[in-house]
Amino acid sequence: MSEQQTAAELIAQGLVHHRAGQISLAMDRYTQVLRNDPRNADALYYIAMVACGEGQFQQGIDLARRSLAYRPQQARAHNLIGQALHRMGKIKDALESFDTAIVCDANFADAYGNRANMLSELGRNAEALSSFDRAIALNPNSPNDWVNRGATLHGAGRIDDAIASYDKAIALDPAFCVSHCNRAHALFDAGRPEEALAGYDRALEIEPKMAEAFLGRALVLKKLARLEDALASVNKAIELKGDVARMHEARASLLRSLGREDDAHAADARAAELEAKKREVSETQPSQS
């Protein structure tokens, strides 16, 4: 058996462990390959994946670039670098990496979907939708692309189209809570509060700790004049995720509607405190290159 066959077998074994969530066993196989061949592009790429999965994004980027040094034109490596850059808040750099991935492989659906997400974050909705449509043409069975496309359509004010996109995501994966929650947001904005409430409730059946769904549910209940129920829902949202200013703002509005002005004032103060902290953190972050 040749050394290259041995490396291929070890990589295959590592992938089995990797997909099963047995990361230490996977790393044993990948690092064994590197001990025998420090220039093995596959081992470097999969170790980069592990690093990114553990939140070590810069290390993952460095490893992926080493893999590219030994085997250029790997679309998957550029895609991984883009994902890591996104997690580091470097949206424009991430977009450039996804563009490079597509140059390497014009039929790489994941890269088109990731590229679309970056364009959407940059407010370039028309380009984002074009990229989502390309991703979906290549892989029509990706719930993530359908739900992210829906979010972009919603942001562009195309509510009915957004709902249709969320419907497609739900048809592909009925247990994807984000699809139900986002669809409920769109239904609420479309003036369909009862359907929106059912959507939030479905999201919470799937993921009972989804703070965003509790907040959305509270806003719908307020619209339906069920103020005490709405307050209970926003309180639950804050219990789950208390560091989001808009949740405290929503609570303040409800308390004010219930005539509890002192409590509303305290909630407003908490929201202002959180907004100030957010601005402070933002000002200390390095600017996007």
Task: Mark where each language-model region is.
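TPR-adjacent "capping" and linker segments in tetratricopeptide-repeat scaffold/adaptor proteins
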Residues: 1-9
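Conserved alpha-helical positions within TPR/SEL1-like repeat arrays
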Residues: 11-19, 42-53, 76-87, 110-121, ...
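Structural marker of alpha-solenoid helical repeat scaffolds
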Residues: 36, 70, 104, 138, ...
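TPR/TPR-like (Sel1-like) alpha-helical repeat modules
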Residues: 239, 249, 253-279
